Amino acid sequence: MRARTRRLYTFGIAAALIVAAAALAFFALRENANLFYTPEVLAEKGLPREGREVKVGGWVEPGSLTYADGGATMRFTVIDNSPSTITVSFNGVAPDLFREGQGVVATGTFTPEGEFTARQLLAKHDENYQPRELKPLEAGG
């Protein structure tokens, strides 16, 4: 084989390997590209299949937070800027910043009835967040 032909084969194989690696990376990461689904997006796309773990996010609707099982299980509604809502149930200790009207991202699965069962809650806050313990210090000086 001539040197030029060998170089072309080597270049072709290298290019094919790079394309294959890029395709594998794209397909592996495309599910993780969306940080969370809002109620509006889930209403448009439909609910994911039962048992598939997803993240849903939005705001905790004021007045929707209730407790059951002696306070062990909480239920609340996640809203966004659309008429769509998601009912979430969570059994565990909520983050300190979790409250009605605040942003939340919940990780979990949908039940056959369409309720979202969260295994993890993340409370979102704005960039101006300051712990309660430091607020008196700021006021004093």
UniProtKB/Swiss-Prot annotation:
Localisation per UniProt entry: Cell inner membrane
InterPro entries given in the database record: CcmE (IPR004329), CcmE-like_sf (IPR036127), NA-bd_OB-fold (IPR012340)
Cytoplasmic side: 1-7
Membrane topology of this protein: Single-pass type II membrane protein
Pfam families from the UniProt entry: CcmE
Statement: the UniProt record of this protein carries the keyword Ion transport: no
Gene Ontology CC terms: plasma membrane
Keywords: Cell inner membrane, Cell membrane, Cytochrome c-type biogenesis, Heme, Iron, Membrane, Metal-binding, Signal-anchor, Transmembrane, Transmembrane helix
Binding locations of heme: H125, Y129
UniProt superkingdom: Bacteria
Cell inner membrane as UniProt keyword: yes
Residue ranges, Periplasmic side: 29-141
Transmembrane domains' residue ranges: 8-28
Swiss-Prot/TrEMBL GO biological process terms: cytochrome complex assembly
A molecular-function term among this protein's GO annotations: heme binding
Primary role: Heme chaperone required for the biogenesis of c-type cytochromes. Transiently binds heme delivered by CcmC and transfers the heme to apo-cytochromes in a process facilitated by CcmF and CcmH.
HAMAP family the record matches: CcmE
Family: Belongs to the CcmE/CycJ family.
Identification of the protein by name: Cytochrome c-type biogenesis protein CcmE
